């Protein structure tokens, strides 16, 4: 998350706690994509967390079940099947879009890329988690409110941490409590423990406020529960 955005989020969290104010976020800059295979290597593949943008029950997964989305089309554009972006269902209204990490634009991974790189489809998820850990070893956990942890310094890909099961198992054990988390925007991931009911209510309010203010960068209003090694839609 960009430093100015992080400071703004922290200030807004404090203001909300004191006066019920919402959160604000700087607008993203438009970028003109330039794709080169030399930049599209296996060590840059990550899984972007994205939203279906609706509550269509056909797309919803109340319990995490990561599996390929097979019916993909790009409106108004004719694309060869092996050039379509590779995407997976995730949990709730969230899905995964595999991409080559680039701070300027989304460069989607396709079946053609898998062939070029000698990868199998089932390798994408574990490779993405491994790459995210390696690419952003300096990510931080900050506390804009005592009850709320905020993931920062992860290249605007903070919600990708939701895919790192080892992190959440360790965090749950450290806290001695089940973990609740929310990704209301493409670069915002907040979490807390479920031990106090007030934590759920506070995280939900923050999530709704962020979601309402970030426009096209919004992800989900749902609070998710880490339970038995997977996420569940919780509140």
PLM region spans:
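Flexible, glycine/charged-enriched surface loops at secondary-structure junctions
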Residues: 139-144, 180-181, 217-220
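Short amphipathic alpha-helix segments
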Residues: 159-171
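Short amphipathic beta-strand starts and helix->beta connectors
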Residues: 171-178
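C-terminal segment of N-terminal export signals and the immediately downstream linker at the start
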Residues: 22-34
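N-terminal secretory signal peptides and thylakoid transit peptides that target proteins
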Residues: 1-15
